[in-house]
Amino acid sequence: MITLIELFAGIGTQYQAFKNNYEVKCIGISEIDPRPLKAYKALFGEPNNFGDITKIKELPKSDVWTYSFPCTDLSIAGKQEGFEGKHSSLIYEVYRLLCVSPKPKVLIMENVANICNTKFMPQFQDWIDTLTELGYTSTWQKIKANVYGGATIRERVYMISILNTDIKYNFPPAIHQDKVLQDFLEPVKNEYYIDEYYGPTPSITKNFFNSVKLCDYKNGGQGNRIYSPYGMGVTLTATGGGKAGSSGGLYYRENKIYKLSPIEMCKVMGWSKEQAQIICSALTPREVGFCMGNAIDLTVLTKIVKGIKEQNIL
């Protein structure tokens, strides 16, 4: 059995991805937001929560640490303060803990695609170099969720770092996607109906590579664009900005405009219907949108962890 510590644990996607591949024991997490913690407890029971990462003195021995630190200062929607911003600078707490704790064999990071843009790539490279000095060999890749079988075009950077080896992790090749958003949806419910649809007649030809925008709704801003369910889903966001589509976007269904239900938001992020029901029983619909918008795509991370197992890294 391998052991896992989840820093910035969220709802526990990292733990579930390992459970999907290994016999694993999560020996502790660090999470201070009560919203994802409610979902975590509902899914896995009461965790050993170390609490605020800035107050952790050291961590116990573990095979794996995950540290998908806050993207707030890296995101396009944020203030673009980078690794020195109030929230994203918490990555340096991971460095501090690596210096005073038994080092894990594997480190896993996920963050927004913006982390490797022209502005932030020097800071990201500095972090990779820091891990190298600590004995880690790192490999990173920018991945859209649908490339690994996910329901959306959510694009994120993933990095695997391995201790005391020259062997690099090889990210799995893209799969042949055979599903579109429609395949993840539940039967239509009127409570998620927004308005009548007067846009162009959508094609039912499936697009496995991208979302298919049909037209704008109202001002056409984020959350006010209508998409075909026969393409890939758009990226879920933690805040809908009060727009009609909230966290999950708007979709044409049965000649009307609908938003995703809380159950559907969980499913398009890789959770089973049974798990989605557990999450939704613990959270309000708004909290589900917040947590799924902040979450890691479970389908993608399960595939990445499977690669760790197949390459005999753990």
Regions found by a protein language model. Name each.
Residues 55-64, 71-235, 239-242, 255-258:
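Class I S-adenosyl-L-methionine
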Residues 70-72, 273-274:
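Short connector loops/turns at beta-strand edges and beta->alpha or beta->beta junctions
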Residues 19-23, 42-45, 78-83, 121-124, ...:
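Short, glycine/charged-enriched secondary-structure capping and boundary segments
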Residues 2-55:
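SAM cofactor-binding core of SAM-dependent methyltransferases
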Residues 16-20, 42, 96-99, 129, ...:
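Short, well-ordered alpha-helices that flank and scaffold nucleotide-derived cofactor binding pockets
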Residues 1, 25-26, 62, 104:
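Local beta-strand N-terminus motif with an aromatic residue
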Residues 199-314:
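C-terminal target-recognition/interaction regions appended to catalytic cores
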Residues 12-14, 70, 80, 151, ...:
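Gly/Ser/Thr-rich beta-alpha loop segments that engage phosphate groups in nucleotides
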